[in-house]
From Swiss-Prot:
Domain of life: Bacteria
Family: Belongs to the sirtuin family. Class U subfamily.
Positions of NAD(+) binding: A25, F36, R37, Q106, I108, D109, H124, S193, S194, N216, D233
Chief location category: cytoplasm
Residues forming the catalytic site: H124
EC number: 2.3.1.286
Protein name: NAD-dependent protein deacetylase
Catalytic activity: N(6)-acetyl-L-lysyl-[protein] + NAD(+) + H2O = 2''-O-acetyl-ADP-D-ribose + nicotinamide + L-lysyl-[protein]
Domain Deacetylase sirtuin-type: 1-246
Localisation: Cytoplasm
One cellular component term from this protein's GO annotations in UniProt: cytoplasm
Gene that produces this protein: cobB
């Protein structure tokens, strides 16, 4: 990676006080979670089994066959041993230093919360929370996994992860909070997102601040509008930043 890019990123971060982070699947790759749509990711694995990933992750699947839906998320989505990596930790650290307004994420893995971030807008929900589809009793991921819980202890109905399934709308309260963050940011740092999945990716066009920074292995549709673009391994980039500040 180019040293001038690292220095420019450091300067932008140091001179900003209202940073907003926008993160995609690339942020969690170093934690051992492949991009859903990448080779070896969840979609690839499901497709090899001759099934439709979009259907298995849909509200229709839940309505059509509750038992099948429950078994699917227990077998495919609940992963116990994945930990936040240096990128999640850096984002949380800047929030704790009051340099950041928070993070907007397309990810459902809950690793930003695990890393210590507090002001998180999870556009597609999170696997850290579950709720009953009948009485809305809430459960944590750890409780669900420890007790192999599939049905509500209060009413006996199905519990589901608090994620946005295909066929469901994004939570409008979360959307408005995310847009408000972006509109008040002086710097927007995009990490590990191709910025092609709508409507979430379109949020970037709402940014009117000073510096748009994009760090992603591949090009994005917004590269030409950015103050700084780094096409490199994200973990290496952030390690360089963290080590230079220590």
């Amino acid at each position: 990676m180019k040293k001038p890019d690292i220095q420019q990123l450091k300067d932008i971060v140091n001179n900003s006080n209202q940073i907003v982070f926008f993160t995609g699947a690339g942020v969690s790759v170093a934690s051992g979670i492949p991009d859903f749509r990448s080779m070896g990711g969840l979609y690839d694995e499901i497709s090899k089994d001759g099934q439709s990933p979009e259907y298995l992750l849909s509200i229709d699947h839940l309505h059509d066959n509750k038992e099948s839906f429950i078994n699917f998320y227990h077998e495919r989505l609940l992963i116990a041993d994945k930990k936040p990596n240096i990128v999640h930790q850096w984002i949380a650290q800047l929030e704790n230093q009051q340099k950041s307004l928070g993070v907007i994420t397309q990810n459902i893995d809950g690793l930003h919360e695990d890393a210590g971030s507090h002001n998180i807008d999870e556009l597609h929900g999170t696997l850290n929370r579950f709720y009953c589809i009948n009485c809305y009793e809430e459960y944590s991921k750890s409780y669900v996994m420890t007790h192999h819980l599939k049905y509500c202890e209060k009413c006996g109905n199905v519990i589901r992860p608090d994620i946005v399934l295909y066929g469901e709308m994004l939570n409008q309260k979360t959307v408005f909070k995310a847009l408000d963050k972006i509109q008040h940011a002086d710097t927007l740092i995009v990490l590990g997102s191709s910025l092609v999945v709508q409507p979430a990716a379109g949020f970037v066009s709402e940014f009117k601040g000073d510096n748009l920074v994009i760090i992603n292995r591949d090009a994005t549709p917004y590269d030409h509008t950015a103050s700084l673009v780094i096409h490199d391994d994200m973990t290496s980039v952030i390690e360089e930043i963290v080590n230079s500040n220590s």
